[in-house]
Amino acid sequence: MRKRAAKKRPLLPDPRFNDQLVTRFVNNLMWDGKKSTAFKVFYDAIDIIETKKQNDEKTSLEIWKDALTNVMPHVEVRSRRVGGATFQIPMQIRPDRKISMAMKWLILYARRRNEKSMAQRLASECLAAAKEEGAAVKKRMDTHKMAEANKAFSHFRF
């Protein structure tokens, strides 16, 4: 085990929106170290959101951030062995972990969609998540349901 917690490495903001959250998302989206390709996919998805959105009061980046917020879980279940039995114990999630889980789920369920390009899939999943629909939001709901069902074991917290 580590002697102390690893230091957080500073992330550079992305070139178009000057936002660190976007860079973090692109790092999760990236495959085989191809960051420029991942940035292109993300920016194309943002442009698609811009064309598909209904209301004019929100920018496409705000819609993406809303989608991320709607996918973000607040509680999760963790396994813990107590006297030979394994219990699923509901736990609060740290803020940075909430964001990472939301990003990973949004990307995972975008990849599972069946549109032509990854940019189109990501745009569709973001638009769906912004409206509280889609597979990524369903995953969050399922996680919350699981935590609610196992609320009785919350006194076993770590």
Curated annotation (Swiss-Prot):
One of the primary rRNA binding proteins, it binds directly to 16S rRNA where it nucleates assembly of the head domain of the 30S subunit. Is located at the subunit interface close to the decoding center, probably blocks exit of the E-site tRNA. The keyword Ribonucleoprotein applies. Signal peptide: none annotated. InterPro entries: Ribosomal_uS7, Ribosomal_uS7_bac/org-type, Ribosomal_uS7_CS, Ribosomal_uS7_dom, Ribosomal_uS7_dom_sf. This is Small ribosomal subunit protein uS7. GO terms for biological process: translation. Transmembrane segments: none annotated. It comes from Flavobacterium johnsoniae (strain ATCC 17061 / DSM 2064 / JCM 8514 / BCRC 14874 / CCUG 350202 / NBRC 14942 / NCIMB 11054 / UW101) (Cytophaga johnsonae). PANTHER family: RIBOSOMAL PROTEIN S7 (PTHR11205). GO terms for cellular component: small ribosomal subunit.
